[in-house]
From Swiss-Prot:
Gene3D superfamilies reported in the protein's UniProt record: Phosphatidylinositol (PI) phosphodiesterase
Active site positions, chain numbering: H5, H41
A single BP term in Gene Ontology: killing of cells of another organism
Protein name: Dermonecrotic toxin SdSicTox-betaIIB1bii
Keyword Magnesium among record annotations: yes
Cofactor detail note: Binds 1 Mg(2+) ion per subunit.
Family designation: Belongs to the arthropod phospholipase D family. Class II subfamily.
Function according to Swiss-Prot or TrEMBL: Dermonecrotic toxins cleave the phosphodiester linkage between the phosphate and headgroup of certain phospholipids (sphingolipid and lysolipid substrates), forming an alcohol (often choline) and a cyclic phosphate. This toxin acts on sphingomyelin (SM). It may also act on ceramide phosphoethanolamine (CPE), lysophosphatidylcholine (LPC) and lysophosphatidylethanolamine (LPE), but not on lysophosphatidylserine (LPS), and lysophosphatidylglycerol (LPG). It acts by transphosphatidylation, releasing exclusively cyclic phosphate products as second products.
Cofactor(s) named in the record: Mg(2+)
GO cellular component: extracellular region
Disulfide links within the chain: C45-C51, C47-C190
Record flagged with keyword Transport: no
Cellular compartments annotated: Secreted
Length: 274
């Protein structure tokens, strides 16, 4: 999976897909009451990027629904995964449950259209900290209460704050989540980061019977040397400001026979068995 990073303006969706991304990440900004308002990162952000692009969240969902719906004029077959980077760190942790309710309802109304949409992308909920786990509880409660619990099959969980992996496991255990879990490891493209935690996540992913990590990705990679390093370690995905660079690296002799771009037929919740 090649995730286009910080795709917050509607016009950026095609831009990143044209560069080779098959997944996009966008930031969701909330008001003080936990209501999702806009797709927006804000300052500071990655080096060399404009941090202020944005869209109204519901309008963004309406557009991305079309982009991921077969036979729609806007349909782009390659886009199979949407990563929602939830800016919960900007609101009170007491509002995390309200935020989870709101995002679930907006996805129901504007993306899935309560069963009337054929939009098919998988959804990854990127949570900044284990302290915000009530968002996940609320999201799942809302799908159940609204009568659309089946959409849980399309939704995965990912904690992005580089926290202790055992602490993340404990929170997932509290929530009763034993599947559909991704694990991110990374840092803004402005800085270098070692591989110790990334290696630990990959080791846990590959441990038989360990159900708290199905996929691992590294972020935000812009240098080809770091992309190569991550691929050699065996990541499932790369988040990048430059998907075209990832494409070029994947075509190199070292990687061409080992990796390919994920398609809709690849289940993002299953561990890869090479």
């Amino acid at each position: 999976w090649i995730m286009g990073h910080m795709v917050n303006a509607i016009e950026q969706v095609d831009e990143f897909l044209n560069l080779g991304a098959n997944a996009i990440e966008f930031d969701i900004d909330f008001d003080k009451d936990g209501i999702a308002q806009i797709t927006h990162h804000g300052i500071p952000c990655d080096c060399g990027r404009k941090c202020t692009k944005k869209a109204i969240f519901t309008e963004y969902l309406d557009n991305i629904r079309q982009v991921t719906t077969p036979d729609d004029p806007k349909f782009r077959e390659q886009l199979v995964l949407l990563a929602l980077d939830l800016k919960l760190q900007r609101i009170s942790s007491a509002k995390a449950y309200r935020a989870g309710e709101d995002v679930a309802k907006k996805l129901l109304d504007h993306y899935w259209q309560r069963g009337n949409s054929r939009a098919r992308a998988y959804i990854l909920l990127n949570i900044p900290s284990v302290e915000d786990y009530e968002f996940i509880r609320a999201f799942k409660d809302t799908l159940k209460n609204e009568g659309y619990e089946s959409y849980n099959d399309k939704v995965g969980i990912n904690f992005t704050g580089n926290e202790d992996l055992d602490k993340i496991r404990d929170v997932l255990e509290i929530l009763g989540i034993h599947k559909q879990v991704w694990q991110a490891d990374g840092i803004t493209s402005c800085f270098a980061r070692g591989t110790e935690r990334l290696k630990e996540a990959l080791e846990k992913r590959d441990t038989p019977g360990y159900n708290y990590i199905n996929k691992v990705y590294a972020w935000t990679l812009v240098r080809k040397s770091i992309m190569r390093r991550s691929l050699r370690l065996g990541v499932d995905g790369v988040m990048s400001n430059n998907p075209d660079r990832v494409i070029k690296v994947l075509k190199e002799k070292e990687f061409a026979d080992k990796f390919r771009l994920a398609t809709y037929n690849d289940n993002p919740w299953e561990k890869f068995r090479g």
